[in-house]
Curated annotation (Swiss-Prot):
It is found in: Cytoplasm, Cytoskeleton; Golgi apparatus membrane; Midbody. Interacts with CLASP1 and CLASP2. The C-terminal 25 kDa form occurs as a monomer. This is Microtubule cross-linking factor 2. Residues 218-281, 310-351, 450-484, 820-865, 1083-1117 form a coiled coil. InterPro entries: MTCL1-3 (IPR049885), SOGA1/2-like_CC (IPR027882), SOGA_CC (IPR027881).
C-alpha cells in the first residue's frame, strides 16, 4: 500500500527492500464518488499497512508509525473537512503526522504483491489484525534486536532526539548495544513504540534484578495495547465515515437520475398530450375535408421539437453511461488494490511469524523467569486474536453491504438499458456517420415516425370512409334524379302524354337534363377529389410500408446484437399490428354496413318505382357505378315496337291485324278518357308514390288512391297493348291450325320470349359487364314462366276482342275493373319473378364485391410491403452515401496532411542533401567548417542554406517547370526526388570515404607525433646532459657573469621559437593537406576530362558525317555547270570549319587537362598566323555557328567541378545553363549594338617582334573571363598569360596555389640558406602562385619562359634581397594602357606592394574583412602574431636568425587570402605605379634589380598612354577587380581588331553612358540576387553612383566598411565586367575586401550558383 503523500519523508530509516512506486495522487471527483465500497485514488486507504515494512529491521522501524500517541490537539484536524467533501484518509494521516511528529520510522514498504481475494472489506480486517499482531511483535522482537544489536538503520543512524520524558538532555547512543531512544516523537505523552521496544531490550538484560522490571514492562505493553486499540477504533471510524460519504454521494446521484427520469417522463406526457391534440385537429380536418397547412407546419415544428428533446435526452443518457463506465473502471482498480493489500497482509503475517519463532528459540535458552513474560505475551496475543476476530466479522458485514451495492448497481444498469431502449441512444456529439449507423437512434426515430404515420393513416382511413358514405349518398341522389328523368323521358310517358301535347313535357325534360348534367359534373368532381385522396392515401401507405420495413429490419438486426433493446420494439410492433388489424376490421365493418344500406336503398327505390318500371332495375340497384345512364332504354323500346309492327305485318293475317287495331284503339280510348286524371298523375310523380302496391284492393274510392291506380293503369296499358297484339296473333294461330300449327305457334314463342327477354338483356347491359354471366345463366328458367303467363292470358283474353270493339261507356266500369284485376295478377306474378332475379343478382354482386375487396386488400398489402422495402433500401443508400462522404472527407484531410508532411520532408531532405554537398565540397577544397558549436547539418540553423537551395539544380528545374508547364512539374517530381535520393546516397558514400581517409590520416599523424615526441625526449635528455656538463666545465663564475637578463632573454627567445615552430608546423600540415586535396581533385578531373574528350570526339565525328552527307546531297542536287564556283566555296568553308573544330577540340582537351591538374605549362607560339589559327579554332570566340550552338552543352563553360559529370548532366543540373536562360540570352542578344560585332583580321602583325607566352591552363583554373559574340552567346576567352589576379576560391586554384607556392618557397628558402645572405623578406604576391608557377625549370617550359624564369631566380639571388623592405608582401599588377586607335602598350609586372596609405586613406586592420574564406579565418588567429613579430626589429637580419625569417615568410605566404597579410605597412614614399609607368620605353628587364618590380614587359610605342595610366590608377584605387581578359587575348583583341573597340576602350569609359548589363546577368534567379544583396553589407550607394564613381574615385572617394576595408558599392552585388577597363581588370583584387568572386559577377553564373565555397561571406556590419 502506498504511503500517504502528505507524511514527511523523514520517517524513512530502515532498509528498503524495493523502491516504492509513486503514490497515487490524492484527488476526489467534485461531482461524484467512484463507488461506496472502494474509493478511487485515495492514497492511504488501507492505512494500517502503509506504516510497516517487511523486513525484521524495518518492521520495528516502520511500526513506529503506530507508536506515537497523538495529542488531542494534533488529533483535531481540519474541522471543515467534512463539510468540504470527502475526507481522504491519506490527507488525514498527513495532518496527524504534522500534529505529532512520529518516531524515525523506516521507509514506506513497497507495494506488496496482489492477493486473489476480491473482498472490499479487508481494510478494516487488515487494520485490526495488524493492531493485534503489533503488540505480539513488540515482545517477540526485543530479544532478537538485543542479541543482534538492533537494526543499524534504526539505532546507530538516528540523530539524537529528546527522550519521551524530556527531563534529561538528549544524548547519542553510546554503543550498538544501547539503542537510541531518541527516535521517538517529542510530542508524545506516552512512551512510543520504538522507544518501548528499545526499553524492553534494556530491561531484558536486567530481568534478574527483580520483578519490578517485569511489572514495568507489562505496564508498557498494556499501554501500547491500549494505544493500538485506540488507533484501530480511529481507523474504524474513519472507514465508516468514508463509506457514509461515498454512500451519500451515490444517493445524491441516484436522486439526480430520478429527477432526470421524472423530467423525461414529464416531457413525454407533454408530447403525448400534443400528439392527442394533433390527432383531434387532424380528425377535424378530415371531417371538414380541408387540409390545414398551418396545422401541418405546426405538427412539423412539434416533431422537430420532440426530436431535439429526444436528442438531448440521449446526450444525457450518454453522459450517464460514461459515468457508469468510469465507475466500473474505478471499482476494478479498487479490487486490484484490495488484492494487493491482501497479499501484503499475508507477507506481513509471515514476517511477523519469523521473529516470533526466532525469539521463541532464543528464549528457550533463557532462564525460567522469562516464562512468566511469555505467558503475558501469549495473553496479549490472545487479546489481539479476539480483536482480529471482531475485525473479521466487521469485514464480513462490509462484504455483505458491498454485494448489496453491486446488486443495486446491476439494477441501475438494467434501468439505464430500459431507459435507453425506450428513448434511444442518440448523442448529438456523435459524428454524422455514427449517427446514421447507431441502431438505437435509428430505431427510436423510426418508432416516432411510425407512430405519426400510423395516426395519419388512421385519420385518412376514417376520412376515406366518410367520403365513401358521402359519395354513395350523392350517387343515390343522382340516381333518384336519373329515375325522375328516365320516368319522364321513357316511351310509356311519351305514349301517355302524347295526346296532351309535348310543350310542357319538353320543358320539364330539358330542365331534368340540365339538372342531370349538373349532377354528373358534380359526380365527376367528386370522383376526381376521391382519386386525389386515394393517391394521397397510397403515398402515405408507401411511407408507412417503408417505415415498417425499416423498423422490422432494424428489429431483426438488433435481435442479434442487443436482445434487450429488441424486446420492447417487438412488443411495440405487435401492438401496432394489432391496431392495424382492428382498423382493418372497422373498415370492413363499415364497408359491410355501407353495402347493407345500399341494398336497403335499392329495395326502397324498387318498391317506389315498381308500378313505373317493372322490367327495369334502378341505377341504385345496379351498384355504385355512376356511369349507368338509363337514357337508351326508351330508344330500345321504340325500336322494339317498330320491329313488332313489322313482324305483325309480315306474319299475321289481315283479320288479326284488324283485331290488333281494335284493341289498340280501345287502349287509345282508355287513355283519352283519362284526361281528368293528368293533374293527379303529376301530383303522383311529384310526391314519388313509394309506398303504393299494385296488388292492393282498388275499391278505395279516395282521391289519391284513384289517381295512383289510374296512373298505374295508364302507364301499363301501353305495354299491354303490345303484348295483346302478339297474344291475339298467337291465339288465332293456335285456334285456327292443327297440331302442326300448334308446333308452329310454339316455335313462334321464342321470338315472344326473346321479345320479353330483350328487356332483360338490355337491363343486363345497363348493369355493367361485371354481372353479365349470372344474368344469362338464368334465361332458361324464365321461359316456362313466361309461357304460363301467356297461356293464362290467352284463356282470359278470349272475350277481349268482342269487348274491345265496343265503345267506352260508363257502365262498362265493372268490366274494366275485372280486366284490371286480371292484369294486376299477371303483373304480380311477373314482379315475383323479377324479385327472385333481383335477389340472385344482389347475392352475386355481394359475392363479387367481397372477392374484389379481398383482392384489393391483398394488393394494398403487397404494395405496402414493396414500399417498405423501397423505403428501407432508400435509407440504406442514404446512410451509405453519407458514410461515403464522411470517409471521403476524412481521407481528403488525411491526404492533405500526408501531402504537407511529405512536402515538408522533401524540403528538409533537400536542404540536408545540399548542406551535405556543401560540406563535402568545402572539405574537399580543404576549407574547414566554422566551429560555431551548432550542428552543421541542422536545417534551420544557417541562413545561407536557403541561398544554397536557390542555387540547387532541382529548385531551378522547379521554377522552370512551374513557369513553363505545371503538368510536367507533377510528372517530373518523383524522378527528381529519386535522383535526389541517388545523389544523397552518392554523397553519403563519398562522405564515408572522406571520413575513412581522415581517420587513416589521423592515425598516421598520431603515430608520427608519437615517434617525434619520443625522439624529442631522447634529444632533450641528451641536451640536458650536455648542458649540465658544459655548466660544470664553465664553472660557477661564468654563470654569475651571464646574469638573469641573459637567461630571461634566452627564455623569451626559446618561447618565441617554440611558438613559431608550432605555427610553422601547423602551416606545413595545412599545406600538405591541401596538396593532398588538390591531387585528389586532379585525379577526379582527369577522369572527367577523359570522358569529355571521348564525348567531344564522338560529336566531332558525327558533325563530320553530317557535313559530308550535306555536301553529297548538295552536289547531287545542284547543277554542276551553274553552281560550280559556289559549291567549291561551300565545300572549302565546311572543310575549313571541320578542320578548325578538330584542332579546337584537341587544343581544348589539352588545355582543360593542363588547367585542371595545375601543371605549370607554357606554350610558345612561333608566329602570329599560328596564334590566329588557334584563335580561329577556339569555341569561345565569334565566327562559328556550331561553336555557338554547342556552347550551352559545353562543360568548359561552367566552373571546373570537383565531381565527375557528363555534359548533359551539367546542363540539367546547373541552373546557370538552363534552356530557358539560353533562350533569354538569345533574345537579349538582339539588343547589342552593332559595334560589338567582332571583326576578323587575317593580317596578324608578325613584324612586331613580340614574343607571346601562351598559358592556356590558367583560363580554366582561375575563373574563365566571359565576353559575348555578335549573336549574344556567352563565350570564354582562352588566352590567358600568367598574371591573372583573380583570387578564385575553387578547389583547384587553392590547391595549386598552396602547393606550387609552397614548393617555390621551399626552394627559395633553401637557396637563401645555401647563400647565407640574410635579406629582407621580399617575395612575390602570396596569393599569386598560379601566376608565378614554379620558379624551377620545368621540362615543358619553352626556351623563352626558361630564360625569364632564370632571370627571376638570378634576381632573387642577387643583392636585391639585401634591401631592407618594410613591406612584407608584394603583388602582381597587370596594367594595360588603352589607346583609342593606336597600338597599345601592355605591361605586366610583379611589383612590390605600395604603401597602404597611397591607395587608401587609412590603414585597415588584418581582421577587418569578413569576406575571407573560412579556412583562412582559422589560420589568421595564429598568423597575426607571426606578422606582428616579423614587424619588430628582432625579426630583421640584424636581430633575428634567417631561419626564423624564412619560416615566418613561408607561414605568411601560405595563407590563402592575400588581403589578410597586407597589414599595417611602414610609411614608404613613392608609388609602385610610378615606378612601372614613368619609363615606358624601358627595356624588358630594366627594373629587375628592384626586387621583381617587373616580371616582363611587352613594350610598344603609343601616342596617348599617360592619361590612360592615370585612369587605370584611379580605377584600381576605386574598384580593384580581377582582369577580364588575358594578356595575349587583350593584345590581339586590340591590335588585330577582334575586340569591340568603342565599348571597351577605357578612355571613353568615363564620359559615355555605361553599357547595359550583359545578357548573362539576367541569368540568375531574382531570389538569389535579393539574398546576395541582403548579405553584401546592405550598401548605401546605388548602381548609378557606382557607375559614375568607377573612373573618378580618388584616394578619399573609396567606399569603406567599418574596419576600413574597401567595399564595392553595388545594388545587386553583381559586377558588370563588360564596363570595366583592362586596367581595372588587371588590378590587384586583394587590396579590396570584396573580391571579384563568381557570386559578384553575373558573367559567371554557373560558378556563382554552384560554388558554395566560392561565395563570399557577408561583410561585418
Amino acid at each position: 500500500m502506498e504511503a500517504p503523500a502528505a507524511e514527511p519523508p523523514v520517517r524513512g530509516c530502515g532498509p528498503q527492500p524495493a523502491p516504492a512506486p509513486a503514490p497515487a495522487p490524492e484527488r476526489k471527483k467534485s461531482h461524484r464518488a467512484p463507488s461506496p465500497a472502494r474509493p478511487k485514488d485515495v492514497a492511504g486507504w488501507s492505512l494500517a499497512k502503509g506504516r510497516r515494512g517487511p523486513g525484521p529491521g524495518s518492521a520495528v522501524a516502520c511500526s513506529a508509525a503506530f507508536s506515537s500517541r497523538p495529542d488531542k490537539k494534533g488529533r483535531a484536524v481540519a474541522p471543515g473537512a467534512r463539510g468540504a467533501g470527502v475526507r481522504v484518509a491519506g490527507v488525514r494521516t498527513g495532518v496527524r503526522a504534522k500534529g505529532r511528529p512520529r518516531s524515525g520510522a523506516g521507509p514506506r514498504p513497497p507495494p506488496p504483491p496482489p492477493s486473489l481475494t476480491d473482498s472490499s472489506s479487508e481494510v478494516s480486517d487488515c487494520a485490526s489484525e495488524e493492531a493485534r499482531l503489533l503488540g505480539l511483535e513488540l515482545a517477540l522482537s526485543s530479544d532478537a534486536e538485543s542479541a543482534a544489536g538492533g537494526p543499524a538503520g534504526v539505532r546507530t543512524g538516528q540523530p539524537a532526539q529528546p527522550a519521551p520524558s524530556a527531563q534529561q538532555p538528549p544524548r547519542p547512543p553510546a554503543s550498538p548495544d544501547e539503542p537510541s531512544v531518541a527516535a521517538s516523537s517529542v510530542g508524545s505523552s506516552r512512551l512510543p513504540l520504538s522507544a518501548s521496544l528499545a526499553f524492553s531490550d534494556l530491561t531484558e538484560e536486567m530481568l534478574d534484578c527483580g520483578p519490578s522490571g517485569l511489572v514495568r514492562e507489562l505496564e508498557e505493553l498494556r499501554s501500547e495495547n491500549d494505544y493500538l486499540k485506540d488507533e484501530i477504533e480511529e481507523l474504524r471510524a474513519e472507514m465508516l465515515e468514508m463509506r457514509d460519504v461515498y454512500m451519500e454521494e451515490d444517493v445524491y446521484q441516484l436522486q439526480e437520475l430520478r429527477q432526470q427520469l421524472d423530467q423525461a417522463s414529464k416531457t413525454c406526457r407533454i408530447l403525448q398530450y400534443r400528439l392527442r391534440k394533433a390527432e383531434r385537429r387532424s380528425l377535424r380536418a378530415a371531417q371538414t375535408g380541408q387540409v390545414d397547412g398551418e396545422l401541418i407546419r405546426g405538427l412539423e415544428q412539434d416533431v422537430k421539437v420532440s426530436k431535439d428533446i429526444s436528442m438531448r435526452l440521449h446526450k444525457e443518457l450518454e453522459v450517464v453511461e460514461k459515468k457508469r463506465a468510469r465507475l466500473e473502471e474505478e471499482n476494478e482498480e479498487l479490487r486490484q488494490r484490495l488484492i494487493e493489500t491482501e497479499l501484503a497482509k499475508q507477507v506481513l503475517q509471515t514476517e511477523l511469524e519469523r521473529p516470533r519463532e526466532h525469539s521463541l528459540k532464543k528464549r528457550g535458552t533463557r532462564s525460567l523467569g522469562k516464562a512468566d513474560k511469555k505467558t503475558l505475551v501469549q495473553e496479549d496475543s490472545a487479546d489481539l486474536k479476539c480483536q482480529l476476530h471482531f475485525a473479521k466479522e466487521e469485514s464480513a458485514l462490509m462484504c455483505k453491504k458491498l454485494t448489496k451495492l453491486a446488486k443495486e448497481n446491476d439494477s441501475m444498469k438494467e434501468e439505464l438499458l430500459k431507459y435507453r431502449s425506450l428513448y434511444g441512444d442518440l448523442d448529438s456529439a456523435l459524428s454524422a456517420e455514427e449517427l446514421a449507423d447507431a441502431p438505437h437512434s435509428r430505431e427510436t426515430e423510426l418508432k416516432v415516425h411510425l407512430k405519426l404515420v400510423e395516426e395519419e393513416a388512421n385519420l385518412l382511413s376514417r376520412r376515406i370512409v366518410e367520403l365513401e358514405v358521402e359519395n354513395r349518398g350523392l350517387r343515390a341522389e343522382m340516381d333518384d334524379m336519373k329515375d325522375h328523368g328516365g320516368g319522364c323521358g321513357g316511351p310509356e310517358a311519351r305514349l301517355a302524354f302524347s295526346a296532351l301535347g309535348g310543350g310542357e313535357c319538353g320543358e320539364s325534360l330539358a330542365e331534368l337534363r340540365r339538372h342531370l348534367q349538373f349532377v354528373e359534373e358534380e359526380a365527376e368532381l367528386l370522383r376526381r377529389s376521391s382519386a386525389e385522396l386515394e393517391d394521397q392515401n397510397k403515398l402515405l401507405l408507401n411511407e408507412l410500408a417503408k417505415f415498417r420495413s425499416e423498423h422490422e429490419l432494424d428489429v431483426a438486426l438488433s435481435e442479434d446484437s442487443c436482445s434487450v433493446l429488441s424486446e420492447p420494439s417487438q412488443e411495440e410492433l405487435a401492438a401496432a399490428k394489432l391496431q392495424i388489424g382492428e382498423l382493418s376490421g372497422k373498415v370492413k365493418k363499415l364497408q359491410y354496413e355501407n353495402r347493407v344500406l345500399l341494398s336497403n336503398l335499392q329495395r326502397c327505390d324498387l318498391a317506389s318505382c315498381q308500378s313505373t318500371r317493372p322490367m327495369l332495375e334502378t341505377d341504385a340497384e345496379a351498384g355504385d357505378s355512376a356511369q349507368c345512364v338509363p337514357a337508351p332504354l326508351g330508344e330500345t323500346h321504340e325500336s322494339h315496337a317498330v320491329r313488332l309492327c313489322r313482324a305483325r305485318e309480315a306474319e299475321v293475317l289481315p283479320g288479326l291485324r284488324e283485331q290488333a287495331a281494335l284493341v289498340s284503339k280501345a287502349i287509345d280510348v282508355l287513355v283519352a278518357d283519362a284526361n281528368g286524371f293528368t293533374a293527379g298523375l303529376r301530383l303522383c310523380l311529384d310526391n314519388e308514390c313509394a309506398d303504393f302496391r299494385l296488388h292492393e284492393a282498388p275499391d278505395n274510392s279516395e282521391g289519391p288512391r284513384d289517381t295512383k291506380l289510374i296512373h298505374a293503369i295508364l302507364v301499363r296499358l301501353s305495354v299491354l297493348q303490345q303484348e295483346l297484339n302478339a297474344f291475339t296473333r298467337k291465339a288465332d294461330a293456335v285456334l285456327g291450325c292443327s297440331v302442326k300449327e300448334q308446333q308452329e305457334s310454339f316455335s313462334s314463342l321464342p321470338p315472344l320470349g326473346s321479345q320479353g327477354l330483350s328487356k332483360e338483356i338490355l337491363l343486363a347491359k345497363d348493369l355493367g359487364s361485371d354481372f353479365q354471366p349470372p344474368d344469362f345463366r338464368d334465361l332458361p328458367e324464365w321461359e316456362p314462366r313466361i309461357r304460363e303467363a301467356f297461356r293464362t292470358g290467352d284463356l282470359d283474353s278470349k272475350p277481349d276482342p268482342s269487348r274491345s270493339f265496343r265503345p267506352y261507356r260508363a257502365e262498362d266500369n265493372d268490366s274494366y275493373a275485372s280486366e284490371i284485376k286480371e292484369l294486376q295478377l299477371v303483373l304480380a306474378e311477373a314482379h315475383d319473378s323479377l324479385r327472385g332475379l333481383q335477389e340472385q343478382l344482389s347475392q352475386e354482386r355481394q359475392l363479387r364485391k367481397e372477392e374484389a375487396d379481398n383482392f384489393n386488400q391483398k394488393m394494398v398489402q403487397l404494395k405496402e410491403d414493396q414500399q417498405r422495402a423501397l423505403l428501407r433500401r432508400e435509407f440504406e443508400l442514404q446512410s451509405l452515401s453519407l458514410q461515403r462522404r464522411l470517409e471521403q472527407k476524412f481521407w481528403s484531410q488525411e491526404k492533405n496532411m500526408l501531402v504537407q508532411e511529405s512536402q515538408q520532408f522533401k524540403h528538409n531532405f533537400l536542404l540536408l542533401f545540399m548542406k551535405l554537398r556543401w560540406f563535402l565540397k568545402r572539405w574537399r577544397q580543404g576549407k574547414v567548417l566554422p566551429s560555431e558549436g551548432d550542428d552543421f547539418l541542422e536545417v534551420n540553423s544557417m541562413k545561407e542554406l536557403y541561398l544554397l537551395m536557390e542555387e540547387e539544380e532541382i529548385n531551378a528545374q522547379h521554377s522552370d517547370n512551374k513557369a513553363c508547364t505545371g503538368d510536367s512539374w507533377t510528372q517530373n517530381t518523383p524522378n527528381e526526388y529519386i535522383k535526389t535520393l541517388a545523389d544523397m546516397k552518392v554523397t553519403l558514400k563519398e562522405l564515408c570515404w572522406l571520413l575513412r581517409d581522415e581517420r587513416r590520416g589521423l592515425t598516421e599523424l598520431q603515430q608520427q607525433f608519437a615517434k617525434a615526441k619520443a625522439t624529442w625526449e631522447t634529444e632533450r635528455a641528451e641536451l640536458k646532459g650536455h648542458t649540465s656538463q658544459m655548466e660544470l666545465k664553465t664553472g660557477k663564475g661564468a654563470g654569475e657573469r651571464a646574469g638573469p637578463d641573459w637567461k630571461a632573454a634566452l627564455q623569451r627567445e626559446r618561447e618565441e621559437q617554440q611558438h613559431l615552430l608550432a605555427e610553422s608546423y601547423s602551416a606545413v600540415m595545412e599545406l600538405t593537406r591541401q596538396l593532398q586535396i588538390s591531387e585528389r581533385n586532379w585525379s577526379q578531373e582527369k577522369l572527367q576530362l577523359v570522358e569529355r574528350l571521348q564525348g567531344e570526339k564522338q560529336q566531332v565525328e558525327q558533325q563530320v558525317k553530317e557535313l559530308q552527307n550535306r555536301l553529297s546531297q548538295l552536289q547531287k542536287a545542284a547543277d554542276p555547270w551553274v553552281l560550280k564556283h559556289s559549291e567549291l566555296e561551300k565545300q572549302d568553308n565546311s572543310w575549313k570549319e571541320t578542320r578548325s573544330e578538330k584542332i579546337h577540340d584537341k587544343e581544348a582537351v589539352s588545355e582543360v587537362e593542363l588547367g585542371g591538374n595545375g601543371l605549370k605549362r607554357t606554350k610558345s607560339v612561333s608566329s602570329m598566323s599560328e596564334f590566329e589559327s588557334l584563335l580561329d579554332c577556339s569555341p569561345y570566340l565569334a565566327g562559328g555557328d556550331a561553336r555557338g550552338k554547342k556552347l550551352p552543352n559545353n562543360p568548359a563553360f561552367g566552373f571546373v567541378s570537383s565531381e565527375p559529370g557528363d555534359p548533359e548532366k551539367d546542363t540539367k543540373e546547373k541552373p546557370g545553363l538552363s534552356s530557358r536562360d539560353c533562350n533569354h540570352l538569345g533574345a537579349l542578344a538582339c539588343q547589342d549594338p552593332p559595334g560589338r560585332q567582332m571583326q576578323r583580321s587575317y593580317t596578324a602583325p608578325d613584324k612586331t617582334g613580340i614574343r607571346v607566352y601562351y598559358s592556356p591552363p590558367v583560363a580554366r583554373r582561375l575563373g574563365v573571363p566571359v565576353v559575348h559574340d555578335k549573336e549574344g552567346k556567352i563565350i570564354i576567352e582562352p588566352g590567358f598569360l600568367f598574371t591573372t589576379a583573380k583570387p578564385k576560391e575553387s578547389a583547384e586554384a587553392d590547391g595549386l596555389a598552396e602547393s606550387s607556392y609552397g614548393r617555390w618557397l621551399c626552394n627559395f628558402s633553401r637557396q637563401r640558406l645555401d647563400g647565407g645572405s640574410a635579406g629582407s623578406p621580399s617575395a612575390a604576391g602570396p596569393g599569386f602562385p598560379a601566376a608565378l608557377h614554379d620558379f624551377e625549370m620545368s621540362g615543358n617550359m619553352s626556351d623563352d619562359m626558361k630564360e625569364i624564369t632564370n632571370c627571376v631566380r638570378q634576381a632573387m639571388r642577387s643583392g636585391s634581397l639585401e634591401r631592407k623592405v618594410k613591406s612584407t608582401s608584394s603583388q602582381t599588377v597587370g596594367l594595360a594602357s588603352v589607346g583609342t586607335q593606336t597600338i597599345r602598350t601592355v605591361s605586366v609586372g610583379l611589383q612590390t606592394d605600395p604603401p597602404r596609405s597611397s591607395l587608401h586613406g587609412k590603414a585597415w586592420s588584418p581582421r577587418s574583412s569578413s569576406l575571407v574564406s573560412v579556412r583562412s579565418k582559422q589560420i589568421s588567429s595564429s598568423l597575426d602574431k607571426v606578422h606582428s613579430r616579423i614587424e619588430r626589429p628582432c625579426c630583421s637580419p640584424k636581430y633575428g636568425s634567417p631561419k626564423l625569417q624564412r619560416r615566418s615568410v613561408s607561414k605568411l605566404d601560405s595563407s590563402k587570402d592575400r588581403s589578410l597579410w597586407n597589414l599595417h605597412q611602414g610609411k614608404q614614399n613613392g608609388s609602385a605605379w610610378a615606378r612601372s609607368t614613368t619609363t615606358r620605353d624601358s627595356p624588358v628587364l630594366r627594373n629587375i634589380n628592384d626586387g621583381l618590380s617587373s616580371l616582363f614587359s611587352v613594350v610598344e610605342h603609343s601616342g596617348s598612354t599617360e592619361s590612360v595610366w592615370k585612369l587605370g590608377m584611379s580605377e584600381t584605387r576605386a574598384k580593384p577587380e580581377p582582369p577580364k581578359y588575358g594578356i595575349v587575348q587583350e593584345f590581339f583583341r586590340n591590335v588585330c581588331g577582334r575586340a569591340p573597340s568603342p565599348t571597351s576602350s577605357a578612355g571613353e569609359e568615363g564620359t559615355k553612358k555605361p553599357e547595359p548589363l550583359s545578357p548573362a546577368s539576367y541569368h540568375q534567379p531574382e531570389g538569389v540576387a535579393r539574398i546576395l544583396n541582403k548579405k553584401a553589407a546592405k550598401l548605401g550607394s546605388s548602381e548609378e553612383v557606382r557607375l559614375t564613381m568607377l573612373p573618378q574615385v580618388g584616394k578619399d572617394g573609396v567606399l569603406r566598411d567599418g574596419d576600413g576595408a574597401v567595399v564595392l558599392p553595388n545594388e545587386d552585388a553583381v559586377c558588370d565586367c563588360s564596363t570595366q577597363s583592362l586596367t581595372s581588370c588587371f588590378a590587384r583584387s586583394s587590396r579590396s575586401a570584396i573580391r571579384h568572386s563568381p557570386s559578384k559577377c553575373r558573367l559567371h553564373p554557373s560558378e556563382s550558383s554552384w560554388g558554395g565555397e566560392e561565395r563570399a561571406l557577408p561583410p561585418s556590419e
